[in-house]
Structures are given as C-alpha cells and as structure tokens.
C-alpha cells in the first residue's frame, strides 16, 4: 500500500466497498437456515411453532365466520355440495397452516434456484474488486504539499460517500433477510385466514408479499451483475489533467456508478411489487 495519505484513504474506502459487495454476493446465495450459523433461524422456528396453536384457533374462528357470512341458514350448510366445499376449504387451510413453514421454504428454494441459474448464466461467479488506477496513484504521489491540499478535501468527501454507500447496500440485503425471518415467524396467523371466504384475501396478500420478498434476492443479484459488467471498464483517467481534477473526475464518476447500483438495490422491493402487481 502507498505511503501517501490521499491514496491510503481512497484505497481503504474502496476496500470497504469491495468487502461489503463481496458479502452481498455471499448473502444472496445463502439460506436463512445457515445465516449467522443458524442461531437466528432456530429462534424463528421456535416462535413459528409457538404461534401454531394461535393459528389453529384462528383457523376455526375464520372458518365459522366464513360459514356464517356465506350461508343464510344452517339448512344450506347441510347440502352435500356446500358441505363438501366447506370440508375441502377447511382441510386445505389446515394443511397450509400446519405445513406453512415447509411451503414457505419450498418457495424460497425456488427463488434460490433462480438466483443460482442467473449467476450461472451470467458467467460471473464473484464480484471484481475496484482498485485505483496506477497512473492516478503515481500522479498523487508526485504532488507536493500545497498541491495535495485540494485533493485532501476531494478524498475526504469521496471516501465518505463510498463508505456510506457501502453500508447502505449491505443494510438493504440484511433487511431482506430480516423480512424473511419476520414473515416466517408470524406465518401461522395470516395463513389461518384461508379458512374463511371473507378473510382469504389476508392469506393471499401474505403469500404474495412473502414471494415478493424472496424475489428481491433475484433483483438484487441482477443489479450486481449489471454493475459488474458496467464497472468492468473503470472510469477514464485524464493523464493530462491536474492531479486534483484527475481525482475529482475519477471519484465523481465512480460514486455515480455506485449510486446507480445502490439505488437499484434499494428499489428492488418496488420493482418486484410492480412486476407482481402488488
């Protein structure tokens, strides 16, 4: 590493960006069961199991409410065709609540398969690290004390932006994991709504929202792949420009590229909702 403070500061901020983006790449292919050693998943499954009793109680309640609202009298309920429909609805709702965790994991595995397929088709197995161009490092190191003063300000601002963007993008990916955990933990309660016709929309909305959260991973991966190809050609460095102008031009274009990626990742949930009509 260079002994120049300006170069060191820029290299450290780029190292933070590279580390966070590598972590994003790893998290997108990781299952919630393996996240942080599986300790969080164990707590979530325990909560899911504890709420199962409440979900089954609500299942009966929603079923009764649905019967009362749908049929005008008990005589209609006793008709074979109506009784069969009610039995099938209750059985399906009971199965959805009881095996809700397995169904949700199956849906997540489908999306994880999509992520693996996208990664394989793109031919990109990891993210290429961003490094400072050698000609820019040489130009900065050749500057005198007074020539370096403008670059200090540019470097401080640029490094701050890059570091903040690094944490924003990793927080967005962590937020997706936490949303999956929350959906999984309380799943028995909204899934019980399938038992009644008036309340079944709650269950449908829950499934759609959960599917959208899962699909966010594929959208984030696509954004990272596009950025990887886009950033394969680093910002051009004007060798004839003054060192301060050279650093400003390079850092400015680099931050713009990063903003595009971070903005796309932050909008992943909105993109999925627009795709699914939510």
Question: What are these regions, as identified by a protein language model?
Answer:
Residues 58, 62, 66, 86, ...:
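Alpha-helical transmembrane spans of integral membrane proteins, capturing the lipid-embedded, hydrophobic core
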Residues 23-26, 82-89, 109, 116, ...:
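Short amphipathic alpha-helical coupling elements at transmembrane boundaries
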Residues 1-58:
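Binding/recognition "hotspot" determinant
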Residues 94-186, 224-277:
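Non-cytosolic segments of integral membrane proteins
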Residues 1-10, 80-100, 203-213, 268:
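Alpha-helical transmembrane segments and their helix-start/interface "positive-inside/aromatic belt" motifs
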Residues 191-208, 240, 271-275:
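Alpha-helical transmembrane segments
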Residues 58-94, 186-201:
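Hydrophobic transmembrane alpha-helix segments characteristic of membrane transport
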Residues 43-50, 79-86, 148, 152, ...:
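Hydrophobic, aromatic-rich alpha-helical transmembrane segments
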């Amino acid at each position: 590493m260079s002994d120049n403070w300006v170069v060191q500061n820029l290299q450290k901020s780029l190292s933070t960006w590279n580390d966070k983006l590598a972590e994003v790449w790893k998290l997108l292919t990781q299952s919630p069961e393996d996240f942080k050693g599986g300790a969080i998943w164990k707590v979530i499954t325990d909560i899911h199991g504890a709420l199962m009793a409440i979900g089954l109680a609500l299942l009966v309640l929603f079923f009764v409410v649905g019967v009362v609202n749908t049929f005008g009298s008990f005589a209609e309920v006793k008709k074979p065709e109506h009784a069969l429909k009610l039995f099938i609805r209750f059985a399906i709702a009971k199965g959805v609540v009881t095996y809700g965790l397995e169904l949700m994991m199956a849906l997540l595995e489908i999306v994880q398969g999509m992520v693996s397929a996208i990664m394989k088709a793109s031919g990109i197995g990891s993210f290429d690290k961003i490094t400072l161009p050698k000609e820019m490092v040489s130009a900065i190191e050749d500057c005198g004390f007074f020539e370096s003063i403008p670059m200090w300000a540019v470097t401080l601002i640029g490094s701050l932006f890059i570091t903040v963007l690094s944490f924003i993008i990793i927080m967005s990916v962590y937020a997706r994991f936490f949303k999956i955990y929350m959906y999984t933990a309380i799943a028995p309660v909204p899934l019980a709504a399938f038992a009644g016709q008036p309340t079944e929309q709650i269950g449908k909305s829950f499934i759609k929202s959960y599917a959208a959260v899962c699909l966010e991973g594929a959208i984030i991966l696509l954004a990272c792949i596009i950025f990887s190809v886009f950033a394969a050609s680093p910002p051009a460095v004007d060798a004839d420009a003054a060192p301060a102008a050279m650093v400003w031009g390079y850092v400015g274009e680099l931050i713009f590229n990063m903003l595009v990626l971070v903005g796309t990742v932050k909008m992943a949930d909105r993109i999925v909702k627009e795709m699914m009509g939510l």
